[in-house]
């Protein structure tokens, strides 16, 4: 029987173990037993907390999105200008918590399996919409709404593409280079546009 008060800790350990296990294998073809072993708990306890693999996988993805949203909100609160807001959005998407090798591999796996899972597809769409709307909010203070939408679409595609590129490579993810690439793209797209920022 699990100890009282241990559930949040055990759930987090299992979610972290799921990220590592999925990332190491590059597939959702993992078992609750494998995830539980990685977490150092029994499969029965994992089933007790999550009720099965599908719910554990969804909880893992929700956790990643929650962390991303929390970090993004904190970073945006520190931004005083549209340019600072854009920089904060890009930096958070390539933060150490998100742009780590196993987490990148887990994200790529989620994208692949979105073709078979409506729940995963829905969560990825939520992520994409939030990224897009956050970028547009800042960009439309610097250019037209139509152009802001196009730039945000391109920046989102670059972020996803950099995750895919790093997931397929053996090198340690280089967040600084990734951030610079996306920032350069946005700067080039905005060049020559009348700025609303003083």
UniProtKB/Swiss-Prot annotation:
Residues 31-50 bind DNA. One of its GO terms (biological process) is glycine betaine biosynthetic process from choline. Repressor involved in the biosynthesis of the osmoprotectant glycine betaine. It represses transcription of the choline transporter BetT and the genes of BetAB involved in the synthesis of glycine betaine. Gene3D superfamilies: Tetracycline Repressor, domain 2 (1.10.357.10). Residues 8-68 form the HTH tetR-type domain. PANTHER family: HTH-TYPE TRANSCRIPTIONAL REGULATOR BETI, HTH-TYPE TRANSCRIPTIONAL REGULATOR RUTR. One of its GO terms (molecular function) is DNA-binding transcription factor activity. It comes from Brucella suis (strain ATCC 23445 / NCTC 10510). Pathway: Amine and polyamine biosynthesis; betaine biosynthesis via choline pathway [regulation]. Keywords: DNA-binding, Repressor, Transcription, Transcription regulation. This is HTH-type transcriptional regulator BetI.
């Amino acid at each position: 029987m699990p100890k009282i008060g241990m559930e949040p800790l055990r759930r987090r350990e299992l979610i972290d173990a799921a990220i590592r296990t999925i990332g190491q294998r590059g597939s959702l073809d993992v078992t609750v037993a494998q995830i539980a072993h990685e977490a150092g708990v029994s499969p029965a306890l994992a089933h007790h907390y999550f009720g099965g693999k599908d719910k554990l996988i969804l909880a893992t993805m929700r956790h990643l999105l929650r962390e991303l949203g929390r970090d993004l909100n904190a970073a945006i609160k520190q931004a005083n200008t549209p340019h600072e807001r854009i920089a904060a959005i890009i930096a958070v998407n390539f933060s150490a918590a998100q742009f780590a090798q196993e987490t990148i591999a887990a994200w790529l796996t989620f994208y692949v399996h979105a073709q078979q899972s409506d729940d995963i597809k829905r969560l990825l769409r939520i992520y994409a919409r939030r990224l897009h709307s956050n970028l547009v909010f800042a960009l439309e203070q610097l250019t037209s709404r139509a152009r802001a939408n196009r730039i945000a679409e391109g920046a989102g595609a670059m972020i996803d593409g950099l995750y895919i590129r790093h997931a397929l490579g053996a090198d340690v993810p280089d967040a600084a280079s990734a951030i610079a690439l996306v920032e350069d793209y946005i700067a080039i797209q905005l060049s020559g546009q009348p700025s609303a920022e003083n």
